[in-house]
Amino acid sequence: MEYSIRQEQQRVVAGFHMVGPWEQTVKQGFEQLMMWVDGRDIPAKEWLAVYYDNPDEVPAEKLRCDTVVTVEPGFQIPANSEGVMLTQVSGGEYAVASARVVNHDFATPWYQFFGSVLADTAWEMAAKPCFERYLNDGNQDGYWDIEMYIAVSRRAG
């Protein structure tokens, strides 16, 4: 899979922290996020899913993710926003790849992307969460165009 290395700025994000099988929690988290953003007129810039665990190593019921929108620095969570958290996605160097997701199969492009990054002789994965940025509304369009981000650092040597 083709990808590029990009320097990303830290993002301020607001949304929901979810624990459990991603095929359930990501969908549920985005449903909650949409209701919150629409109901409070939140000025959302980007829609992201942030992944903290390796599904090959962590049991499905313990997988952690955040479903969030980027907001301006200094954003204040409005009253009556139960469960909403304000946090950051770290900046730094990231491998970035694009994919079109059909039939809700987000795993295949991620596995392809990880395989490509693991084979890279100049870059290695850094110990930071991965995330994906949504470029369209897949519920309306029937597919999702996404950008996938894996934190990287130069290999020693």
Curated annotation (Swiss-Prot):
SUPFAM superfamilies: Probable bacterial effector-binding domain. GO terms for molecular function: DNA topoisomerase type II (double strand cut, ATP-hydrolyzing) inhibitor activity. The keyword Cytoplasm applies. InterPro entries: AraC_E-bd, DNA_gyrase_inhibitor, DNA_gyrase_inhibitor_GyrI, GyrI-like, Reg_factor_effector_dom_sf. Transmembrane segments: none annotated. It holds the Pfam family GyrI-like. GO terms for cellular component: cytoplasm. The keyword Transmembrane helix does not apply. Its main location: cytoplasm. It is found in: Cytoplasm. Keywords: Cytoplasm, Stress response. It comes from the Bacteria. NCBIfam families: PRK10016.1. Belongs to the DNA gyrase inhibitor family. Inhibits the supercoiling activity of DNA gyrase. Acts by inhibiting DNA gyrase at an early step, prior to (or at the step of) binding of DNA by the gyrase. It protects cells against toxins that target DNA gyrase, by inhibiting activity of these toxins and reducing the formation of lethal double-strand breaks in the cell. Interacts with DNA gyrase. This is DNA gyrase inhibitor. It comes from Enterobacter lignolyticus (strain SCF1).
